[in-house]
């Protein structure tokens, strides 16, 4: 029969030994906890650094459009997207327009919804992926805005806002500086002189010069854009074919000519002149005001009412001491400087009218109605232009309606500089 294994008696420890073991375990536990605490502290510090350096700055809101908020990460991503598709521009240049583009994309989205025109994120994502393009919130919004713009023009404006046909007029037109010149040119037109030649000789508006006076057959909205003046069009759409207008006064359109009246009162040094001056709309007006000044009329009152050069007007005609400019530069214009620094200019005397090319407001139109068509079909180019104009009007109206909801105030110059630098770095890293 097998012997029973003798059970060992548990080892007994003295009170002193037990106290020692307990202290040892406590030390081990403290060391362990301390180690864990150090690790946790390191993780917290690293995480806090990441939070402060990356997460928090990237996730702060920089632009608001109503309830829609756009953070710095979105701003940077949008800047990168536009930078990659507009390689001819630096990120600094694109950043000038970026806040408005972000707002515009959101307004297009909001404005399209009441028209029943929407595109889901999923559809945009699929479109981007099929084109091997990266997908992000920014790229989705950019692509959506582009697609919505096309659909709004095709499905809304092109159908409901812009007709297929409209009244159209073909006009020849030019603006001259004064009523007397207009009367002279009108006689030449009636006598059969070539209109294009007359434009080259007499026209003072940039629009007539650009098109040689021939604005073609178009609806009014197109001609409004080409002429940038209502006076000639009011006449043309109410006149018969073949009509030549009388001189039509226009006090708002600008022309590329004006006339100086200058009085050099003193020369403090060889390179300085003390000057009084007015810049006036026409030669006739300049002659009249010169006579009034020489008769003792008040310079301040005349400059305030008639001068069309801002420095002259703001200083009430007293332009003060002007220093001769360095070579290849001017203080005002070549014509102005040439007179005031000419040693032969007589002091204290008003000059004759000196023509110059600074723009002035006001002139007289002559219009010849070449052709008129009632409710004629629009050309494809005109209709496309009209659709784009109406779309621009629609977008401007959205800005007006939502002006109080648009907030750029959080997008500081420091944030923009930081965003540009970060975007440049990320683009460089991606390219490397």
Where are these regions (language model features)?
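Secretory-pathway/luminal and periplasmic proteins that interact with or process carbohydrate-rich
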Residues: 132-138, 196, 205-213, 309-316
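N-terminal entry motif of extracellular EGF-like repeats
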Residues: 213-227, 232, 317-325
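Conserved hydrophobic/aromatic "anchor" residues
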Residues: 75, 195-196, 299-300
